[in-house]
Protein backbone atom coordinates (compact mmCIF):
# COMPACT_ATOMS: atom_id res chain seq x y z
CA UNK A 1 0.00 0.00 0.00
CA UNK A 2 0.86 3.65 -0.25
CA UNK A 3 1.63 6.11 2.48
CA UNK A 4 0.21 9.63 2.20
CA UNK A 5 3.15 11.28 0.45
CA UNK A 6 3.70 8.32 -1.88
CA UNK A 7 0.07 8.64 -2.95
CA UNK A 8 0.31 12.38 -3.70
CA UNK A 9 3.66 11.85 -5.43
CA UNK A 10 2.13 9.20 -7.71
CA UNK A 11 -0.96 11.28 -8.55
CA UNK A 12 1.11 14.33 -9.45
CA UNK A 13 3.54 12.28 -11.55
CA UNK A 14 0.62 11.57 -13.93
CA UNK A 15 0.59 15.32 -14.64
CA UNK A 16 4.37 15.51 -15.06
CA UNK A 17 4.92 17.20 -11.70
CA UNK A 18 7.71 15.70 -9.62
CA UNK A 19 7.00 15.90 -5.91
CA UNK A 20 9.61 15.22 -3.28
CA UNK A 21 9.21 12.05 -1.24
CA UNK A 22 7.85 12.99 2.19
CA UNK A 23 5.11 15.36 3.36
CA UNK A 24 7.51 17.86 4.97
CA UNK A 25 9.48 18.10 1.72
CA UNK A 26 6.34 18.36 -0.43
CA UNK A 27 5.18 21.31 1.68
CA UNK A 28 8.15 23.33 0.33
CA UNK A 29 6.91 23.02 -3.27
CA UNK A 30 4.30 25.32 -4.78
CA UNK A 31 2.61 28.45 -3.48
CA UNK A 32 0.96 28.91 -0.08
CA UNK A 33 -2.83 29.23 -0.28
CA UNK A 34 -4.25 31.58 2.37
CA UNK A 35 -7.35 29.55 3.25
CA UNK A 36 -9.35 26.49 2.39
CA UNK A 37 -11.95 28.73 0.72
CA UNK A 38 -9.28 29.88 -1.78
CA UNK A 39 -7.95 26.38 -2.50
CA UNK A 40 -8.46 24.66 -5.83
CA UNK A 41 -9.10 20.98 -6.52
CA UNK A 42 -5.71 19.29 -6.69
CA UNK A 43 -4.01 21.52 -4.13
CA UNK A 44 -2.19 19.74 -1.34
CA UNK A 45 -3.21 20.09 2.31
CA UNK A 46 -0.73 19.35 5.09
CA UNK A 47 -1.54 18.19 8.60
CA UNK A 48 -0.30 17.19 12.00
CA UNK A 49 -2.10 14.68 14.22
CA UNK A 50 -5.18 15.97 16.07
CA UNK A 51 -4.08 14.45 19.38
CA UNK A 52 -0.98 16.66 19.50
CA UNK A 53 -0.69 20.24 20.69
CA UNK A 54 -1.86 22.37 17.72
CA UNK A 55 0.85 24.93 18.48
CA UNK A 56 3.60 22.29 18.13
CA UNK A 57 3.44 21.77 14.37
CA UNK A 58 4.97 18.54 13.13
CA UNK A 59 3.88 17.79 9.56
CA UNK A 60 2.91 14.15 9.46
CA UNK A 61 0.26 13.88 6.74
CA UNK A 62 -0.65 15.20 3.29
CA UNK A 63 -3.75 14.86 1.15
CA UNK A 64 -5.12 16.07 -2.16
CA UNK A 65 -8.10 18.43 -2.10
CA UNK A 66 -11.06 17.35 -4.21
CA UNK A 67 -12.85 20.61 -3.40
CA UNK A 68 -12.99 22.85 -0.32
CA UNK A 69 -15.01 20.25 1.62
CA UNK A 70 -13.50 16.89 0.60
CA UNK A 71 -10.01 15.46 0.60
CA UNK A 72 -8.54 12.24 -0.74
CA UNK A 73 -5.66 10.89 1.31
CA UNK A 74 -3.92 7.64 2.06
CA UNK A 75 -2.89 5.86 5.22
CA UNK A 76 -2.53 2.23 4.20
CA UNK A 77 -5.59 2.62 2.00
CA UNK A 78 -7.16 5.54 0.16
CA UNK A 79 -9.88 7.51 1.97
CA UNK A 80 -12.16 10.37 0.97
CA UNK A 81 -13.11 12.40 4.03
CA UNK A 82 -14.54 15.79 4.90
CA UNK A 83 -12.20 18.73 5.48
CA UNK A 84 -12.69 22.16 7.02
CA UNK A 85 -10.40 24.86 8.43
CA UNK A 86 -9.77 22.63 11.47
CA UNK A 87 -8.69 19.61 9.45
CA UNK A 88 -9.84 16.14 8.39
CA UNK A 89 -13.04 14.76 9.89
CA UNK A 90 -14.32 11.19 9.72
CA UNK A 91 -17.98 10.51 8.86
CA UNK A 92 -18.83 10.59 12.59
CA UNK A 93 -17.28 14.06 12.90
CA UNK A 94 -14.10 12.96 14.69
CA UNK A 95 -11.16 15.27 13.91
CA UNK A 96 -8.18 13.11 12.95
CA UNK A 97 -5.64 15.61 11.62
CA UNK A 98 -5.15 19.37 12.19
CA UNK A 99 -4.87 21.43 9.01
CA UNK A 100 -1.55 23.29 9.03
CA UNK A 101 -1.08 24.63 5.50
CA UNK A 102 -2.34 24.39 1.92
CA UNK A 103 0.03 24.48 -1.04
CA UNK A 104 -1.22 25.36 -4.51
CA UNK A 105 0.57 23.16 -6.99
CA UNK A 106 -2.26 23.21 -9.52
CA UNK A 107 -1.54 26.91 -10.10
CA UNK A 108 1.93 25.97 -11.34
CA UNK A 109 0.55 23.13 -13.49
CA UNK A 110 -2.09 25.35 -15.10
CA UNK A 111 0.48 28.05 -15.86
CA UNK A 112 2.80 25.51 -17.49
CA UNK A 113 -0.07 24.22 -19.65
CA UNK A 114 -0.86 27.76 -20.81
CA UNK A 115 2.80 28.36 -21.71
CA UNK A 116 2.91 25.14 -23.74
CA UNK A 117 -0.03 26.15 -25.97
Task: Enumerate the predicted regions with their spans.
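Well-ordered beta-sheet/strand-loop patches within structured domains
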Residues: 40-43, 96
